[in-house]
């Protein structure tokens, strides 16, 4: 029974991540797991390389800004679209299942986030091939907070080298871009 509970808790945490909960507090709210159980599940999933804890490049020790992310795109896709809807699959035409549960946000939310990871990987590979000058030694997200303007947010693809930070604008669209874009 304890092993089944552990599997259920792991699935619940992975489902929370799949539905967009990234911060510890958001995962806790979604899963309603006790803090000790949640911490244990997150550690176990991390040790299995299913998830990792991601910190902003400019705040590597800020636990409040840490986010949990999937390490594998297929696992991410499964828990985002399939896991919570799997009971419907046996009763539906595959195209209708896609239209109802996957299609509505695949191009507008899921793929653009994955594209950011692809861009980070491209930059890392380019850096290793000495195609970026000066070479960077860190890559990640950059968090900002402007209390006077009551504004905060993050940049998704940022590198750091000996001269400072370089910010990259990453957009994924399902349409051709014009030269002005």
Positions of PLM-derived features:
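Residue-identity detector for threonine
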Residues: 29-31, 108, 159, 163-166, ...
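Short conserved micro-motifs at the rims of enzyme active sites and ligand-binding pockets
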Residues: 80-82, 169, 179
């Amino acid at each position: 029974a304890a092993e089944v509970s552990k599997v259920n808790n792991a699935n619940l945490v992975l489902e929370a991540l799949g539905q967009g909960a990234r911060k510890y507090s958001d995962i806790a709210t979604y899963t309603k797991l006790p803090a000790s159980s949640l911490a244990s599940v997150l550690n176990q999933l991390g040790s299995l390389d299913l998830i990792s804890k991601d910190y902003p490049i400019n705040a590597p020790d800020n636990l409040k800004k840490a986010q949990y992310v999937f390490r594998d795109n297929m696992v991410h896709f499964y828990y985002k679209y399939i896991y919570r809807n799997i009971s419907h699959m046996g009763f539906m035409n595959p195209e209708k299942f896609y239209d109802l549960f996957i299609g509505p946000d695949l191009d507008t939310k899921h793929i653009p986030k994955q594209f950011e990871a692809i861009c980070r990987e491209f930059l890392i590979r380019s850096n290793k091939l000495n195609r970026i000058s000066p070479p960077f030694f860190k890559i990640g997200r950059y968090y900002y907070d402007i209390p006077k303007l009551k504004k905060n947010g993050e940049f998704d693809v940022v590198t750091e080298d000996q001269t400072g930070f370089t910010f990259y604008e990453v957009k994924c669209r399902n349409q051709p871009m014009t030269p002005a874009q």
